[in-house]
């Protein structure tokens, strides 16, 4: 790794894929070949995790940031984002939007910027109704909050959450009762 003389083996395993496996101890249980159910804590995974060994689990986005932070320094990373939510966030932009796909923006970017400047706006001249963040556990953000800076605290304050970065745009034709 970076000509350090250090190397290691990496095993990639498929888990059960159940929604509950987003919880770290349920994911470990699934990787071990068992039903993906959360484990009681303590012990915490850093002490006794996968196969009863110390384990660090993070999402791919977190691990992808590490090389750039090592190369550029923590101050570089902290120079992006907001006071409480540093760095960038990857979103999977979908729904009623011209430009769907993965995008990475600094924390603090507004929902309006993501939808209209990056996403290209709503097709067919339709009006924006809401955006869902945080997946099934998140919430729907109405038009009155389009200019709120996106970060962990602000999303929670308006009844949603960041989650893993899903961002689904809805237009005037979406029925919020059906969405719920």
Locate the predicted segments by residue.
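Short amphipathic, charge-patterned alpha-helical segments
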Residues: 107-123
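Short polybasic amphipathic segments
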Residues: 90-93, 129-133, 167
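Hydrophobic alpha-helical positions that pack around
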Residues: 1-107, 119
